[in-house]
Curated annotation (Swiss-Prot):
One Gene Ontology biological process: auxin-activated signaling pathway
Disulfide-bonded cysteines: none
Localization in the cell: Nucleus
Family indicated by similarity: Belongs to the Aux/IAA family.
Keywords assigned: Auxin signaling pathway, Nucleus, Repressor, Transcription, Transcription regulation
InterPro entries documented for this protein: AUX/IAA_dom, AUX_IAA, PB1-like
Compositional bias segments (type: Low complexity): 142-153
Gene3D superfamilies associated with the record: Phosphatidylinositol 3-kinase Catalytic Subunit, Chain A, domain 1 (3.10.20.90)
Lineage, highest ranks first: Eukaryota, Viridiplantae, Streptophyta, Embryophyta, Tracheophyta
Protein name: Putative auxin-responsive protein IAA29
PB1 domain mapped to chain residues: 19-114
Note: Lacks the EAR-like motif (domain I) which is conserved in the Aux/IAA family.
Protein source organism: Oryza sativa subsp. japonica (Rice)
Length: 171
């Protein structure tokens, strides 16, 4: 008679638990999903499942397990960036480190639409630029570079050589 438990157990490397669940968050969704890393042997398998999940976030875990890596399933053409946080809270792109390192250090995975990732980069760049501009104006004169030129209070009305003193309606 065949032992049921022997065939049901996933093949796991020594030192790792048979299940390694990691929370996956889809951008714009209020909740996360868990996936079992022990069911994946490489980045290709994991990224296929994550991209398929990104296209069908409401899919049940049983439906996701039944997926095979086929191009007609639509996951290959998905336009998602896959990111993850390690145990130290540092964010990486999926595939930046060797698979063995990833499986032992991953804490959370994020599925982000590619255009959203670019918008986030732009927003972070704008915030960095605004912070740099605020710190560059050390003396508060409105000039980021202190080149000896500063706006005086009486120069505020001066627009292209025209001042309020030249206008008779200001009497």
């Amino acid at each position: 008679m065949k032992d049921r438990n022997a065939s049901a157990e996933p093949v796991v490397k020594p030192g790792l638990s048979p299940s390694r669940f990691v929370k996956v968050f889809m951008h714009g969704e209020p909740f996360g999903r868990k996936i079992n890393l022990a069911l994946h042997n490489n980045y290709d398998s994991l990224s296929f499942t994550l991209k398929k999940l990104g296209n069908n976030y409401s899919m049940s875990p049983f439906e996701l397990e039944g997926l095979v890596n086929k191009e007609e399933d639509g996951a290959i053409d998905s336009d998602f960036d896959l990111l993850y946080d390690d145990m130290d809270g540092v964010r990486y792109f999926l595939g930046d480190v060797p698979w063995e390192v990833f499986t032992t250090t991953v804490k959370k995975i994020y599925i982000v639409p590619a255009e959203q990732q670019n918008e986030n980069d732009y927003q972070e760049e704008e915030e960095d630029n605004a912070a740099a501009a605020a710190t560059a104006d050390e003396d508060g004169d409105g000039a980021a570079a202190d080149d000896g030129v500063a706006a005086a209070a009486d120069d505020v009305d001066d627009v292209a050589g025209y001042t309020s003193n030249d206008d008779p309606s200001f009497d």
